Structure formats: structure tokens, C-alpha cells
Amino acid sequence: MKHADLISQMTLEEKVAFCSGSDYWHTASIERLGIPSILWSDGPHGIRNSVGTHDKDEPKKKDKKGEGMDALLGGIPAVCYPTAATTACSWDPELIYGMGELLGEECISEKVSVLLGPGTNMKRSPLCGRNFEYFSEDPYLAGKMSAAFINGVQSKGIGTSLKHYAVNSQETRRMTVSAVVDERTLREIYLTAYEIAVKESQPWTIMCMYNRLNGVYGAENKWLLTDVLRHDFGFEGMIVTDWGAENDRVLGLLAGQNLEMPTSNGDGNRKIYDAVKRGEISEDFLDEMVDGVVDVIMRAKEVLADGKGYNAGEHHAAARKIARESMVLLKNDDNILPLSKKAKVAVIGQMAKKPRHQGAGSSLVNSIKIDSAYNTMFEAGIDVIYADGYAMTKKEKKNSPETYIADAVEAAKKADVAVLFIGLTDEFESEGFDRTHLRIPPEHVALLSAIRGVTENIVVVLAGGAVVEMPWIGETKALLNSYLGGEASGSAVTDILFGDVNPSGKLAETYPFSLEDTPCYNNFPGHTATVEYREGLYIGYRYYDTAKKNVLFPFGFGLSYTTFEYSDLKVSADSIKDTDTLKVSFKIKNTGDRDGAEVAELYVAQENSTIFRPEKELKGFKKVFLKAGEEKEVEIELSKRAFAFYDVDLGDWHVETDNYKILVGASSRDIRLEGSVKVESTVDAPVKDLRETMPAYYSADVMNVPDDQFKALLGHEIPESEIHDYPNLTFANTLEDSACGKNGAKLCKMLRKFVGSEGMACSIALQTPVKNFVSMSMGVFSEELGRQLLDILNDKKPMGRGILVLIGKAIPAVVKGLPNLLKNI
């Protein structure tokens, strides 16, 4: 232990106090031992410190957000950087490292010790409401970007919390659903990004997920937290729950989870204390868990004492640079872009003035300054004609859509080119709920169609944090995907549209033609009890490329205002052992007349695999800046893992002796160079041929995998997919689980009427376990009230007037507060 001297001076009560937060955002402290309380804060692309820089024991000053639970929704003004979905498209770890440094400086200024991020979950389905917070569908790219982010933040002496470890790929029933996943898929897809981040950056903390993995909650999954994370990956830091993710405090601690957040008002501490007294937990083991918490506190203590400020203007400028290097040019017919600064431009769409620059939920930042594309064009002297194009607010939506469209059409008629700002709104994607389709608002599509009726010179700037369908793409000459570009997204868009910056972003996820094309279409978001990952390894381009499925835009795709030529591929050897390192080199030349940057992508494909594998997998990449006419040589090294698959029987990564193609290109579908190397295995282990038992996985025909093949993949029976707990519901059940009962149906109907029938509030109210109503209500909803509620939900007690009055005092506060509270998760 690192802090045995301090821990030896603690009482048992003091030790267990360090196993949970002292409130929503702080850890415990012991003044006599010089152990301060530290502050945690969201989030991955900007500080969302709802507490501020006041001392923990001082009362918080009132602000416009008020006090109590609603106060948690607020946040200090901070720089809002592009979201992970955006920055991943930069394919530039150095850029993300720099962003991490800036966030670290801001944490120091606000006395934040641990920043909750990055989010490293895999984009299994484009429907996931939180995809804007995650990097990629590819674990190698996500892992490299995560490691860069972590190293950047922690270089300033501030901790990070890599989240949400590890199989948390949906918002529907995110607190209770069990992800049913085979071990090979876990190791190769859902755990690899975390493994890379841990081995290359050692985050101070890792946040475990809410949901269950193969029946076991993430917060108490010993295999996941100890066997894999600590033993296999070599994680040395502290494990913290997601806010409110604790299910059984004693099991969580024994599984290797150090800290429960937020405070459990002493309940979790009492359970640990009693377990120690019973001998269920040894005090030596408790000391080790406490040591992990104390270590994080003491590492941050010295830096926070400096209390240095930061230059908000410089950080805003950096956010602009990050945004413009991450945005992706998807279409540019007739080289309509870049636009002439002398052109008369119709700027259409309210997003041009009110950019959707970030997502909704726990990552929501109170941006210091927001650049709009309209203002930055106007300030640059561009001749601009503006039209709203569509309604944004409820009040505006009472007006006729035709009125907005008519004004926009008139503006387009007077201009040389029409630039339309359209995309996903907060109502269409957010933390707390998943999308049910991939469409953008219909009024945006109608607007584009109307403008196309009067001009063919149309440029679309698409905003949003996730993949969308584009049956309308033929209506526009150019398409710039700005994703969610942070507070400087507007100026970054202007920089690209008018050629001050050459776009260099490339997609970190595949854009299919339709939702029905996605590999997990029939298995997302799953059932009431489970979600089955029947597609196995085949997510994203691994599926589309192997199944030869046509896509709208492939993984790794992105255009530039210049052109690049690849040549002279060399491999350091024709044959290597799996213990050797292979060096791959090639040249890239800028053959256009503009300076620009190209992302070179390296994929590996096994030629004659016995085990089923994706057609090819990303194993290296490099972003290279080249002046017009310049040529550079790129070198990428490949080690054993670039050729290996995870052998479940062997319990290790294994390379099958075979020839492997080395593929270098501009996207997964645009391979420019090809080489080959023979790799010889140094481990004498047979590779199973599973074609007879799992043929669907050899052909990537995974849309409808039969039960027998999925069972064979899992290596065990397929778990029951539906919840049948009524009338024996427990604190782990949700209100939605009671809907089949008489009282539960009434209560669910009442709540839908109270919070609305869809969106974040409805999802949270109905899909939050009763235990979280207790733990997250700041004492408003007591455990006793929870028991009484369960009696009602189980139809053991009538919904009489007296109990309704009692519950009625708490339910509104909890339901109103939960969306705000859970936005802090």
C-alpha cells in the first residue's frame, strides 16, 4: 500500500467513510491526518462543475438555478470543446492530448481533482442516445484517442475517470439491462479500447457502468473489475461507480470497486462496517480499497493548492482549432467549396445563429462564449442574407412551417449560393433515451427540398452527435458534417466553408443507408431483462465490409480541398514470428495546389483464417500535414496484437500461422496500397474450425443469428430475456417492471402524464430502479417509503388515499429532480 502510515491511524469508521462520497461531488476527508476532500466534475469536453470553487463546508451561494436538487443542473461558465464523436474524426491523438492539457488547466482553476471522462464505449448501434460522447465503432481508434485525452489531462496533475467500463452501449434500461455477450467479442471489441487506454495512460480512476454484463452488475462484477481490469490490463488506480450505480455495497467492494458515488447517506458505509465486523470483509482488504481512494486524493492535493487560472480566450481559440480539424467534408460536387468571400450567401436555418454545439445530459457545459456561423461570416465581411428556415422553440412551432420555408426560398433566390444549417436537435438525441430512427427533423428535409427548387448551388452544414440517414443527399452539392463542434463550432464552420482551413476530418463511424442495414437492428435495444449481442464481432465496418454491404459513407472517409497520392509500400520482412515487430512504411504526396492533412489508415486482413474474423481491422493510422506538392514517408509498427484474435479456450491472444495482408488507404473502402507478410505462431495451439456450428459468423450473416448458433458462441444457455418479477419486485426493479400489475399500471400512467410520454424525463422516471429513487433523492425519498412503494407495485397494498398522499409528497420531487440529478451522471 502507498499510504499505509495514514490508514493505520484511521478508525474503522473513518476507513469505511472513504468508501463512499461525502456528498454528490466530494470524497471524505480527515483533517487531523491532512487528507482533504476532493471535488469531481463532469465532463469529457468541458468542466461542468455545479459546485463551483467554494470550499466544501461553506454554503453555496444562491444562483439563478436555485437550491436543492435543481441546483445540480447548473454549472460554472467553462469552455465547451467538441464532443468525442467530433474529435475522434480528427484522427489526431496529439490534438486530443492538447485538449486534455487545456481541460487539466481549467480543472486546476476550479479546484476539480478528477474529471469524469473520457467516454470510451463502443458505438454498437447508431441509435444510442449517448453516442455523441463516445469516440468510435472501432476499439483501436477509441483506445488511442482515450489514451491521448487521459495523458493530456493527467499531465497537469489532474485525474481522469475512464468510463463507462465496459459494455454500456445504450440508454434504454441502462441501469438494469443485462448485456449478453460472448467472451471473444468482449475481449476484441468492448474491452480493447479500455485496455489500450489503461496500458498507455493509467487513468487515475475508472468508472464502472450501471448495467449488468451476463447477469452481473458492472459495479460488483469481480471478473470485470479485478480479473480483467487489474490483473490482465494492469490497472493501478481506483474504481468508482457511476453516480447511483451501486447495487450491493459489500459485493461491490469485494469485487474490487473502491468508491461509491454519490453519498449513500451512510447506508453503504454501515453495510461495509457490519461486513467487517462479521468477518465477511477482512480489514486488510478494506485497507487496500481505502488506499486507492486516498492515493487519488493525495496525488491531486499538491496541484490544487496552486490554484492557477487560465486564459479563456486562448482556450476558446484552441477549441476552434480542434473543431475545424475534426469536421468532415462528405460531399463537394463541382468543387463548390471553398466558397468565394465575394459571393452573396443565403444563410438558412436557425442553427446558423444558435448552433447545436454540444449534447444534452451530464456533459452539458455552460459555455463561456458561443460562436455562430452567421456572426462569424458577417464579421468576416461576407455578403449574407439570413432566413430562419424552420422553427426551434415550442412557441415558434405554432407558426406555419410554410412561412419559414417561403422566407428561406426568397433568400435563396437572391444569393449565389445557399448554405443550409440543419441536423439533429436535442429532442432527437440525448443522454437518457435512445433514438428510434435515424432521420433528421422532417421540416429540415422539407426546407432543403424547397430550396433545391430555386437553386442547385446548395451547401448543407449538418449538426448532430450521431449517424443519420440521408435520402436527401442528392439535393445538395456539398455536405460538411460539423458534428457537435463545441462553443467555437460556428467560427470553425466559417473557416472551412471559405477556405481559410482545409478540412481534414475523417469519419470514425460508418454511415449506412438505413437503420435496417445495421448489424444489431433486430437486437437493439433488446428486451426487458437482456440485450443480446448476437452480431458478435461484427459491429460497424467490421460488419459492412465483411458482409459486402453498400454504405452511404464508409468508416474513415473524408474529403479535402486537395488530393493525395500513396506510394512505395514496404514491409520490414516477408516473414516474422508473432513475437517480432513488423515495420510498415509508405509515402504520401500532396498532389493538389493547397496545403492539407491526410489520415492514412492501416488495416490487417488474414488470408486463410480457420476461425471466423472480420474481413479487415484497423491496426494503425497516422495524420500527416503536407504542403502543396510535398511528400513524406510514414512508418507504422505492428506487433503481435495486430495479427491476433482472442482464443477463449487458450485464455489469451493467439496468432494463427498464415499470410496477412497489409492494407493502407484513405478509408476502409478506399485501399491504395497492399502488401503481405507471413506470421508464424510461437504457441502450439490448434485453432478451431467452427463452420459447422456457427456458419452465420463466417459469412457475417448476423442480422438473424439462430438460437443454436448464438448459444454456441456464448458457450452456455441463452438467458431469459424478459422480466417476470411481479409480484415480487425488489429495490432493483423499475416502475416499468410493475406495469403488468394493477397499481403499477396506474402509477406508470400517472407518471407519463406528469413528465410526458417520451424523452429523457419519461425514460428516467419509468426505467430508474426503486433503489435509485432512494439513493439519488438527497433524503427526499426514504428507504421506508421505497418499501411502501414496492408493496403498492406488487399489489400487496391498495393505492389508498393515505399512501397516495404520502408518496405524493415525494414522487414529484424525485421525478422532477431525477432528470437533473441523472444529467450529472
Can you say where each PLM-predicted feature lies in the sequence?
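Glycoside hydrolase catalytic-domain context in secreted enzymes
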Residues: M1-F643, N659-L663, S668, M778-G779, ...
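Short amphipathic alpha-helical segments that mediate assembly, nucleic-acid/protein binding
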Residues: H3, L12, G744-L747, G786
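Conserved catalytic region of serine esterases and O-acyltransferases that act on ester linkages
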Residues: I576, T581, V683-V702, A765, ...
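Terminal connector regions
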Residues: K640-P686
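Charged, amphipathic alpha-helical linkers/stalks
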Residues: G675-N743
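Surface-exposed polar/charged interaction patches
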Residues: H716, F754-S757, D795
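N-terminal, non-catalytic alpha-helical interaction modules of very large eukaryotic scaffold proteins
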Residues: A739, N743, C748, V755-G759
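C-terminal non-catalytic accessory extensions
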Residues: A761-I825
